[in-house]
Regions:
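Residues that form or flank phosphate/diphosphate-binding pockets in enzymes
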Residues: 43, 78, 133
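Conserved CoA-thioester-binding segment of acyl-CoA-metabolizing enzymes
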Residues: 2-73, 113
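Glycine- (often His-adjacent) and acidic-residue-rich active-site loop
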Residues: 72-114, 130
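Gly/Ser-rich catalytic serine loop of serine hydrolases
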Residues: 124, 128-133
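Conserved catalytic cysteine-centered active-site region
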Residues: 111-124
Length: 133
């Protein structure tokens, strides 16, 4: 099966359509953010990065939240960047791919800086693998 067909199948899987990338649960003053793509090992895809960035910003702005805990669903915290998303696309030039990957990496760096500069304590509850974390 070609890489393009695999990517299309993954993007259209029921889990990908229905489930949020990040589960959010406030327990007392602790905001739990759980990466929610266990079948794919919770990769840092564009969607996951955007959802985490948004959830962290919301927790930062919420006066009820004192602590944020990042967790992963399933046996792995995160397998790192989504390599399928980084793969060349049909008809894409080298420069187009480089620009697309640069956007993904820039968004990820901004998310990481959001964690570093958060006014809230952020704790990672890591189980299993945590690649490129």
């Amino acid at each position: 099966m070609s890489q393009d067909k695999l990517q299309t199948i993954d993007q259209h899987a029921p889990e990908a359509e229905a489930a949020p990338y990040v589960l959010e649960e406030l327990r007392g003053h602790v905001q739990w953010l759980t990466l929610n793509r266990p079948r794919q090992r919770n990769p840092l895809s564009s969607g996951m990065i955007a959802a985490l960035s948004s959830a962290i910003a919301a927790a930062d702005a919420d006066p009820r939240v004192r602590v944020v805990v990042l967790a992963g669903s399933g046996p792995v915290f995160s397998a790192g960047h989504d390599l399928r998303e980084m793969s060349p696309r049909p008809g894409e030039t080298h420069d187009q791919r480089a620009a697309r990957i640069r956007r993904i990496l820039d968004d990820c760096a901004a998310m990481m800086l959001g964690i570093v500069h958060s006014p809230k304590a952020i704790i990672a509850c890591v189980q299993g693998t945590a690649t490129a974390a």
